[in-house]
Amino acid sequence: LILSGNKSMTFKELAFSCWENRISLSSTGFYKTPKISWDQEKFKGSPYFYFTWGAAVSEAIIDIDTGESRILRADIIQDCGSSLNPLIDRGQIEGGFIQGIGWLTCEELYFNPEGKLLTLGPSTYKIPGSRDVPPEFNIKLLENTPNEEKTIFRSKAVGEPPLLLSISHFLALKNAVSICLLYTSPSPRDGW
């Protein structure tokens, strides 16, 4: 119910009246991030309002006969500033990390000779599934690290940065493959 002076109407009536009278109920705005600059020629400046830091360690296993791999464990610590909602931040960190695993291990774009994208949906474009989440997944939010910049309650955004932490999984796989090669490399004794 909307009240204005002695008049009242429901929200539905108000929306319909606006539609009938061609009154837009939407708005557009722009945000200019403060304190950012970049000089491409000097390769100097501050391209971001603030930075967030994180670190990750992953443990992986690979089947040398089939090439199938699994992530066994991931340990992540992430700087969130003064977290507004630790559960949401943890979800963002988990999601970004798993998205990164997909980017580095199973997602591929295929195009036909005319340039048309062929991997258009779940049947042709493989994304991470529930088995790609490590059975042991430890996330810690770095404590006592309020943002130095004047952000909302000195928080930091953590939606995209954890994507790059998944490089730890790629490097764990690389290490596992190199160990396999170390023990399976042909030698003169093997008749090579």
Task: State what each model feature region is.
Residues 1-185, 189:
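C-terminal catalytic domains of large/alpha subunits in multi-subunit enzymes
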